[in-house]
Amino acid sequence: MFKKLDPSPKWIVYDNNPVMHKPIEDVVFPLTKEDEHVISQMLSYVDASYEGEADKYDIRAGIGIAAIQLGCPKKIIYIHLDDKNGEHKYLMANPKIIKESTSKMYLKNGEGCLSVKKDHKGLSIRKSIVWVKGIDLFTNKEIEVKATDLLAACFQHEVDHNNNKFYYNRINESDPYYVEKNWEEI
């Protein structure tokens, strides 16, 4: 169903492209051939990054991607990362954050994005814990994931793409490095 491809930097659509600001559609099943091709690209791109092969393919390394970043306006995300809790690998259709903590966090080095050429300085403030529901495209079953730390930030980042938002939209414009004492640094 999904094919391993050689990832290309030409696949990535940037934030200044009007496609990135159009409404994103829910995925309807069964998947189309186009859906399967885009998912193959998503898996190939992020897995090459995960396996340390970004330089080999001259791509910018990433831990997550949304279908819209490849020009496909459908709610599909793929995350593949390691953190203190181990390896995480999620390919989801129609992901939705259904619950979130009141506590907040930020990544101490800030965030980046495959679709943003010029990095924006500052801290993207995120919820510390999120519960995400969607269709697991590896099993074709609905799942609910409780995510914390880097995984929570990544889910929020990718779901933001489905709402035409970027990490820099979460940076305080007047004080980009503003934090409160009770916010957790990741």
UniProtKB/Swiss-Prot annotation:
Catalysed transformations (reactions): N-terminal N-formyl-L-methionyl-[peptide] + H2O = N-terminal L-methionyl-[peptide] + formate
UniProt: Fe cation binding residues: 113, 157, 161
Matches recorded under InterPro entries: Peptide_deformylase, Peptide_deformylase_sf
Domain of life of the organism encoding this protein: Bacteria
Reported cofactor(s): Fe(2+)
Enzyme Commission number: 3.5.1.88
Positions annotated as active site in the UniProt record: 158
Pfam family, any one: Pep_deformylase
Gene3D superfamilies in UniProt: Peptide deformylase
Gene Ontology BP annotations: co-translational protein modification; translation
Transmembrane regions listed in the UniProt entry: none
Cofactor binding notes: Binds 1 Fe(2+) ion.
UniProt keyword terms in alphabetical order: Hydrolase, Iron, Metal-binding, Protein biosynthesis
UniProt GO molecular function: metal ion binding; peptide deformylase activity
Role according to the record: Removes the formyl group from the N-terminal Met of newly synthesized proteins. Requires at least a dipeptide for an efficient rate of reaction. N-terminal L-methionine is a prerequisite for activity but the enzyme has broad specificity at other positions.
Family the UniProt entry places it in: Belongs to the polypeptide deformylase family.
HAMAP family: Pep_deformylase (MF_00163)
Protein name: Peptide deformylase
